[in-house]
Structure formats: C-alpha cells, structure tokens
C-alpha cells in the first residue's frame, strides 16, 4: 500500500472530490 505517500494522498483526495461531484 502507498497511502503513506503524500502525493498519492493528495491524488486520492482529489479523486474522491471528483467522484462526489459526479455522483
């Protein structure tokens, strides 16, 4: 798992925000 990577954290946060937008 790479959830400790700060860049990945930011990307996942952005992805979740986009997902919420499309939902």
From Swiss-Prot:
<protein>
    <recommendedName>
        <fullName>Prolamin alpha-3</fullName>
    </recommendedName>
</protein>
């Amino acid at each position: 798992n790479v959830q400790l990577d700060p860049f990945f954290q930011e990307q996942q946060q952005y992805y979740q925000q986009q997902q919420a937008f499309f939902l």
